[in-house]
């Protein structure tokens, strides 16, 4: 039987974008309505059909078209995300591609910042998702000493770095999606190493540069906390901070870090105090020649970060809500169908790996070939979406995942997926990981497709704004107590070996940096969760700038000009992993926002003793 052809209607494609009738126009809150967006959206349909009709087999393409799973980034002929070695860029410079401008290794802090911007912006155009550097403060510290820099000079360079990383310079008029990880204190495995700067080995070690690291962190925090000229937050780079057992909670810059977090909620906090994460894995992935395929490794550095010279070749997310609906009361049948979908997802990822590697070898991704060369250390990623709605449909809405029966089912399902990951690693020789995929557009696509096919399926949201709860997260209106959420999510969060994070959505600015610090400290020391964020809601008025909390119109403007039209404001919060205005969310994510019960400090303060599902670290 011949597979049906899906020809792209050029006129309809352009008009659907221009009149915004195509749901993809707002699927990604980082991509504004623009000429670049029109070009990407139009070209993306051609590329997606190329993948589905020419590269993948019909048996792989059909479940995507029908909504059984979602093959991410079909509109881009590229791998998903990548972590790069900042040390290598500093030592070698940005060069090595024929016919392109070549930069020698940087000798100064300012030129290193310039090469970082150029590198991330250029590599972003060879990948679909996040681009990451680890140990930013450690690797940049030698320049501060060699240049004998004043603090104000560092701030100026940091302003240029951050502003330039927030310019919509990539395909589709988007900002490069970037992540920087900060060590805060020099890691043990780098402490005795002498940096190589400008082809010369310096006479000091990374471990002697704590003062310079402190200046870099202080400057970065100052610029990010200040926001742009209108008081608007910088969306990128997303900062990840490594919180290790020796993290000094009363040390230099800590108050500034948590003042920034209380106001804007920008950082991801990576838990090296009380989790399975190993700080040295950030750098060791790129030099492990023999990986044990019987174990599941962690990608490192959070939902949008990757350890050095690793990342993900691609992501396939399973529609769990549909499985719960189709196999109501039949867990054995549900698991059997899930296994079939995982096998197909794996086939798609193996084909993608082979395809992208072939074209990397033949010059389509020249900078990735220069600085990476091989995809051997890149994971194949399988994710889940709508575990809560899976349970609700499976039980005919008798219970959800907050019920012990639903929770236990989710644990069994995730353990089965992990088991399959190991089998796939041994069968293919490639690394696999399980991710709580952000599914920003996917959650709405799944809900929309399921509503068409199964009108009585149980969904979150409303008929006008349907969505599925992300991964195995709690229902968004379940509790206002962040510590209750941590207690209930700790076990499930630990099942993921790719990106996962628990966002603590706060209704407004946390009352103080000290209160914010205490919330993070208690969370990371009490619970074995790999990553958390504090995510306050805030608003931006064109006249008054930053306003704490949700304000779709400005009260200050109304008080000053009671007879004038209300002054509209942007309301900002995380759309999964990064901050964007709620007004730019897709329909499903708006539905989620409207239903979300925000966490409160009052509820957190009243919680009492924190109870972990695991024994304390010292007793294990």
Where are these regions (language model features)?
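Glycine-centered flexibility sites
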Residues: 383-386, 498, 577, 588
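Residue-level signature of transmembrane alpha-helix interfaces in integral membrane proteins
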Residues: 199, 399, 449-451, 590-596, ...
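Intrinsic, low-complexity terminal and presequence regions
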Residues: 539-620
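Short alpha-helix boundary/capping elements
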Residues: 188, 395, 576-580
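Metallocofactor- and cofactor-centric catalytic cores in central/energy metabolism, strongly enriched
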Residues: 154-158, 162, 393, 580, ...
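Conserved catalytic cores of very large enzyme subunits
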Residues: 2-376, 397, 403-562, 571
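Extended amphipathic alpha-helical segments enriched in small hydrophobics
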Residues: 378, 382-391
């Amino acid at each position: 039987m011949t597979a049906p052809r899906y020809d792209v209607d050029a006129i309809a494609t352009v008009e659907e974008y221009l009149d915004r009738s195509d749901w993809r126009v707002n699927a990604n809150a980082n991509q504004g309505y623009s000429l670049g967006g029109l070009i990407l959206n139009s070209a993306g349909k051609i590329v997606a059909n190329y993948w589905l009709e020419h590269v993948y087999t019909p048996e792989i393409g059909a479940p995507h078209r029908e909504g059984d799973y979602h093959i991410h980034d079909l509109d881009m002929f590229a791998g998903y995300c990548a972590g790069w070695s900042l040390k290598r860029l500093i030592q070698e410079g940005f060069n090595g591609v024929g016919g392109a401008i070549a930069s020698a290794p940087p000798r100064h802090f300012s030129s290193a910042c310039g090469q970082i911007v150029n590198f991330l912006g250029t590599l972003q155009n060879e990948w679909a998702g996040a681009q990451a550097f680890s140990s930013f403060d450690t690797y940049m510290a030698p320049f501060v000493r060699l240049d004998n820099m004043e603090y104000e000079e560092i701030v100026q360079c940091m302003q240029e770095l951050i502003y330039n990383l927030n310019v919509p310079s990539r395909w589709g008029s988007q900002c490069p999606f970037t992540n920087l990880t900060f060590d805060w204190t020099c890691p043990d495995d780098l402490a005795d190493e002498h940096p190589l700067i400008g082809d010369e080995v310096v006479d000091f070690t990374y471990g002697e540069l704590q003062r310079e690291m402190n200046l870099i962190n202080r400057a970065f925090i100052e610029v990010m906390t200040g926001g742009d000229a209108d008081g608007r937050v910088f969306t990128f780079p997303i900062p990840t901070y490594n919180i290790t057992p020796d993290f000094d909670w009363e040390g230099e810059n800590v108050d500034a870090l948590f003042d920034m977090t209380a106001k804007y909620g920008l950082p991801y906090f990576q838990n090296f105090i009380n989790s399975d994460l190993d700080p040295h894995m950030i750098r060791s992935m790129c030099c492990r020649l023999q990986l044990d395929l019987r174990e599941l490794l962690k990608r490192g550095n959070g939902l949008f970060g990757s350890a050095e010279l690793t990342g993900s070749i691609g992501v396939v997310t399973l529609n769990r809500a549909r499985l719960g609906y189709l196999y109501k009361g039949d867990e054995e049948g549900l698991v059997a169908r899930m296994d079939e979908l995982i096998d197909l997802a794996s086939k798609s990822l193996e084909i993608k790996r082979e395809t992208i590697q072939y074209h990397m070898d033949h010059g389509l991704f020249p900078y990735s070939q220069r600085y990476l060369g091989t995809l051997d250390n890149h994971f194949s990623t399988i994710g889940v979406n709508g575990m809560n709605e899976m349970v609700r449909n499976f039980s005919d809405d008798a219970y959800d995942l907050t019920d012990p029966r639903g929770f236990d089912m989710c644990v069994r399902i995730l353990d089965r997926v992990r088991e399959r990951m190991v089998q796939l690693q041994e069968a293919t020789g490639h690394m696999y990981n399980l991710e709580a995929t952000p599914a920003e557009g996917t959650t709405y696509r799944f809900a929309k497709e399921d509503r068409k096919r199964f009108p009585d399926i149980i969904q979150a949201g409303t008929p006008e704004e349907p969505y599925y709860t992300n991964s195995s997260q709690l229902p968004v209106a379940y509790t206002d107590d962040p510590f209750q959420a941590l207690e209930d999510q700790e076990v499930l969060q630990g099942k993921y070996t790719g990106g996962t994070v628990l966002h603590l959505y706060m209704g407004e600015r946390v009352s103080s940096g000290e209160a914010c610090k205490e919330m993070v400290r208690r969370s990371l020391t009490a619970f074995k969760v790999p990553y958390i964020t504090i995510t306050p809601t805030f608003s931006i008025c064109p006249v008054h700038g930053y306003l704490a909390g949700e304000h779709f119109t400005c009260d200050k403007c109304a008080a000053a000009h009671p007879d004038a039209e209300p002054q509209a404001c942007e309301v900002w919060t995380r759309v999964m992993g990064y901050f964007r205005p709620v007004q730019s969310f897709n329909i499903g994510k708006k539905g989620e926002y409207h239903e979300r019960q925000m966490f409160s400090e009052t509820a957190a303060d009243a919680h009492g003793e924190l109870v972990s599902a695991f024994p304390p670290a010292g007793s294990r």
